[in-house]
Amino acid sequence: MHFTRTWLSCALALTSLLAQLVSIAQAQGSPEAQATVEDLGKSDPIAAAQKILEFPGIFDPDQSLWASDANITGTGDLQQVPWSRGAFFTWNPWTIGTYKTGYLWLPERFNMFKLNRSLVVSKSGDDIAIDPFYVNKHYDPEKIERAIILIPGQWRDSWKYLNLLGNAYRVAQKYPELNVGSGKVLMLSPTFMDEVDRKRGAMKKNEITFQKAGWSAGDTVRHPRAFKHMSSFDVLDFYVSMLLDRQQFPNMKTVTVAGHSMGGQTSMHYAMLRDLTDEDARLKYWVGNPGSYVWLNDTRPFSTAKCPEYGEWPYGMSVHKSIPRYGRKGSGKNGVHRIENFLKRRIHFSVSLDDNGHGPENCKANAQGVSRVCRAAEWVAQRGNSTEGWSKSHTIDFIPGVSHQDYPVIAYYGTLKFLFTDQE
């Protein structure tokens, strides 16, 4: 009798555990709920974000990755998207190394792109600073009407990101209403390499390198030492100015600074700190699935009791001394002037509805939410409860059935429309 009770207790416990596991696996927005959010986000981003915050498991930090259950595009970036209409897909180039160990070399030529190692972004006496970048193999500057500066993610693999953009470009050409003409789009990706890449042999003498991922928040150059004052955002300024220069590109209509993941964070950080200029009417930003957001006020959806630094840059604007020198001057109390400029810029956000990976796991990020999709929804939703509100210059796509995947997000129709056209 005792054995029977013990067996029964174990069976009930196992059944309960299995039920919990099934519940965890299924705790996410259903395809129907995600489709509703996708549609609502086009007209009312704040209401759509509030719907996301009703998804089962959205506040659970121990969720299994939703990508394993409901993705419509697999779980990576090594295949064409279902909506490609037969567009050709090119695999990514390769090198040896990782973002932690450093790279042995930079791929030279692939797909429709090549590596340019001759761009001098700054001079100081006899010293020069060169930033290698990837760009179209062939183009006529007089025919270029649009340029996309694609910032890499944490792995610093600009070659991969630009190859994915090239694949997305071919998908865009399959949609006649987008009118993406051949030879009119210049695609390029700067490199933001690490000191460890220099030690492994990937970087040459005068080529700039940074320390770890500091470049994503506006950190300064580590090498060459003559340029230790130069911010990664100064480098982006150089690219933007070059592309908007009528002497070099007489028919340029629009330049877009774009990025996904850490590249998305970089794009947002740059949009927040860059000065507003007369040329900004021709400048746009695309922010895809950043791991955290620059909050526009001091509120946070989760406790900050054990995180007094929660408002520091790049998680907020309220700690003046934490703002990089690049954008500190004239930022105003709590960054008010930078925030005013940010709200005027043309920015498009992309949020994957299966992207429940943690992203940064420090207390400043965790005060914003438990995952990337949770942080995105909280950041959008709080703008409905603040004086800033949702800017008319900002748009957003909530992407169903996609997780933290570079290519499906870049190749999503709404992203293609923003990157390759000026259609509203």
Specify the residue positions occupied by each region the protein language model found.
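Conserved acidic catalytic loop of the alpha/beta-hydrolase fold
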Residues: F233-K253
